[in-house]
Amino acid sequence: MAANYWESTQRKHWQFTKQDLAAIRQRLDDEDPGLVQMFPLPQLRHLNIYFNQQINRLSKRIGLRQQVMATAQVYLKRFYTRIAIRQTNPYLVLTTVLYLACKMEECPQHIRMMTQEARSLWPSDLHGHDPARVGECEFSLISEMHSNLIVHQPYRSLLGVQDEFGLTQDEMSLAWTVINDHYMTDLPLLHPPHVVALTAVLLALVLRPSANTPAAGGAGGNAGAAAAAAAAGAGGVAMAATALAQAQAQVQARAAAIAAAGAGGGTPGFGSQGSQQQAGFSQGNSQGSLQGDSAAAEPKKVTDPRLAKVQRFAAWLADSNIDIEAMVDCTQELISFYECHEQYNDKHTKEQISRFIKARNLDK
């Protein structure tokens, strides 16, 4: 994998704004409005939840690691910014993105075995498909993604800050789950992986279960993170918002002081690529931040260990070059996703997908 996210095709070609994504999807719908009207689909978040579950199911049958599943989900999102969902058999695409991700993550699987497992899992929707169809779909997938197959994930950044922030095993487990869950949103197409990782850390700190409530872990365990969000309620969300607001206020105050001193009109290096490599930051600089600025960020003694850790995290953010506005957006998107998950109906989503597959003979 390429070490430098900032020089990667992911950053150059596969990071969009929300407005860009909305325009792309609208353009795909406008290509065949009759098809859209004839075969309505659930909202995109519910489709993402369903696709995530199916990738997890197929992966477990084969024994694949989380990294492979994550890469497959990114491929799926990229592909569906180029091709309308209703033009494809999603089960064939799910099989193919997982097959291709296995190759890229250096754990290749035989195409016949992958096809056999997929047909066993979705017999009514893939009964007419053979390995040749997966091979054809793979060619189309690579072509539509312009052979941009290297994917930078947030997991490495999360592991890189575990000791830095003194994260407990429960906090790491919850943060890992939040990262798993972000693949059911548009965040992999919107923000750099280190921003997602830091957002996951913040949410793990403020939504962390009590001592007698086990944290959720594992692949795609969004029920655990959603339950933690529900248990924390508005208080946990408010704590996250306050931490980000404090960090942003310190950044703005520092910028104003520099401007007043005649040293420049903005925060030096804010969002610069030099200090935001794949890990998102320099460990040495971050240690200095924690030791040097945390005292200034904590004017009074904090007795709650969790609140103290959140405040230290906010102080570190203020002294870093991390895009705090992007973290705010990530936080809002994830909280909104957990709320949306409450309305998810698996049976309805499956029926809507199967309806257009059968009607258009895409299962043959």
Swiss-Prot record:
Pfam families (UniProt xref): Cyclin_N (PF00134)
Source domain of life: Eukaryota
Could you cite one Gene Ontology molecular function of this protein?
Answer: cyclin-dependent protein serine/threonine kinase regulator activity
**Which GO terms of type biological process are on file?**
regulation of transcription by RNA polymerase II
* Region described as Disordered: spans on this chain: 268-303
Main subcellular localization, coarse class? nucleus
Limits of the Cyclin N-terminal domain: 53-143
What do the Gene Ontology cellular component annotations say? Answer: nucleus
Q: How does it assemble?
A: Component of the SRB8-11 complex, a regulatory module of the Mediator complex.
Q: What does it do?
A: Component of the SRB8-11 complex. The SRB8-11 complex is a regulatory module of the Mediator complex which is itself involved in regulation of basal and activated RNA polymerase II-dependent transcription. The SRB8-11 complex may be involved in the transcriptional repression of a subset of genes regulated by Mediator. It may inhibit the association of the Mediator complex with RNA polymerase II to form the holoenzyme complex. The SRB8-11 complex phosphorylates the C-terminal domain (CTD) of the largest subunit of RNA polymerase II.
For this chain, the family text in UniProt reads: Belongs to the cyclin family. Cyclin C subfamily.
This one is known as RNA polymerase II holoenzyme cyclin-like subunit
Source organism per UniProt: Chaetomium globosum (strain ATCC 6205 / CBS 148.51 / DSM 1962 / NBRC 6347 / NRRL 1970) (Soil fungus)
Instruction: Tell me the name of the encoding gene.
Output: SSN8
